[in-house]
């Protein structure tokens, strides 16, 4: 027996608590991992809410990522004692997740933790860090590079994905990073993370604004996505990976047909496994 957070649903409520469970409570997989760390994400918060839209079948062990040590394996790629991590693949959604002392998953979902990275560090990055790195990877695929020092806009600058994105961009050598925040108290935080400039977002109804930015890494969605798209330069590129501001995008077509901008969706759940390993 071991401890796990278990989410249960009644007719009008969702409840969760730490319970004693055994391996029969875990979803199927050919690798059993002793979980050492699991990060807490926005999606995990939704998973614990009634009508959160994340968990469909109850009871469920939440936790959309985890890192730990292989306890046992019938998969040739992994052996007892290996340090590994898992993000995405509906872990903590339809497959029992990381808020447990043990997790069991198919070996195809597992990424070996690089030798130079500790188990703890891998979950300091976690799903948020992986999504941030994946967004940067896509922007660089479409031309963003350190040599040209482009103007980069990042939303959700003090949130999980946005804060890590700014730190990674700054660490690898990008200098012209502008952060979007909603409150004045977030300005200094964003600057400490590596932002050169900080904007407090304001609503506007104009279909197109002066082009300022070459690339836009959006982590928030909805009206914030629109805010950045309208301010991209000719042939600017944007990625979007989050929907904390909402699911709707009431955009107009002008930035696309007059400036030839591109909007790329970022999915960190089912992304190709080879890309996962490259990112980590």
What is the meaning of each model-derived region?
Residues 24-39, 51-91:
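Glycine-rich beta-strand-centered segment in the early N-terminal region that forms part
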Residues 82-83, 102, 237:
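Residue-level marker of beta-strand positions
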Residues 85, 214-217, 239:
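N-terminal Rossmann-like NAD(P) cofactor-binding module of classical short-chain dehydrogenase/reductase
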Residues 87-152:
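NAD(P)H dinucleotide-binding glycine-rich loop of Rossmann-like/cofactor-binding domains
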Residues 99, 182-189, 247-253:
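Short, glycine/polar-rich helix-capping loops at beta-to-alpha or helix-loop-helix junctions
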Residues 129, 156-163, 221:
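Glycine-rich NAD(P) Rossmann-fold beta1-alpha1 loop
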Residues 154, 170-223:
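Adenosine-nucleotide cofactor-binding segment
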Residues 223-280:
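Glycine-rich phosphate-binding loop and adjacent beta-alpha segment
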């Amino acid at each position: 027996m071991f401890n796990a957070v278990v989410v249960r649903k009644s007719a009008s409520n969702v409840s969760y608590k730490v319970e004693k469970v055994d391996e029969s409570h875990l979803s199927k997989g050919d690798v059993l991992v002793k979980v050492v760390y699991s990060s807490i994400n926005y999606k995990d918060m939704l998973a614990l809410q009634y009508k959160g839209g994340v968990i469909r079948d109850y009871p469920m062990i939440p936790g959309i990522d985890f890192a730990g040590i292989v306890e046992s394996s019938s998969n040739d790629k992994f052996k007892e004692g290996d340090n590994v991590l898992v993000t995405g693949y509906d872990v903590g959604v339809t497959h029992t997740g990381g808020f447990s002392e043990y997790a069991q998953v198919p070996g195809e979902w597992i990424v070996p933790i690089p030798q130079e990275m500790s188990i703890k560090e891998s979950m300091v990055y976690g799903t948020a860090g992986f999504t941030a790195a994946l967004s940067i990877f896509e922007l660089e695929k479409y031309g963003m590079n350190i040599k040209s020092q482009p103007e980069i806009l990042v939303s959700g600058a003090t949130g999980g994905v946005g804060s890590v994105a700014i730190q990674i961009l700054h660490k690898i050598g990008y200098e012209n990073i502008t952060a979007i925040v909603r409150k004045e108290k977030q300005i200094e935080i964003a600057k400490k993370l590596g932002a050169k400039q900080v904007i407090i977002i304001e609503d506007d109804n104009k279909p197109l604004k002066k082009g300022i930015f070459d690339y836009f890494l959006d982590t928030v969605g909805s009206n914030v996505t629109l805010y950045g798209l309208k301010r991209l330069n000719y042939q600017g590129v944007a990625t979007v990976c989050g929907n904390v501001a909402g699911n709707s995008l009431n955009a107009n077509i002008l930035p696309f047909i007059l400036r030839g901008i591109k909007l790329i969706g970022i999915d960190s759940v089912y992304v190709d496994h080879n890309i996962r390993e490259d990112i980590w």
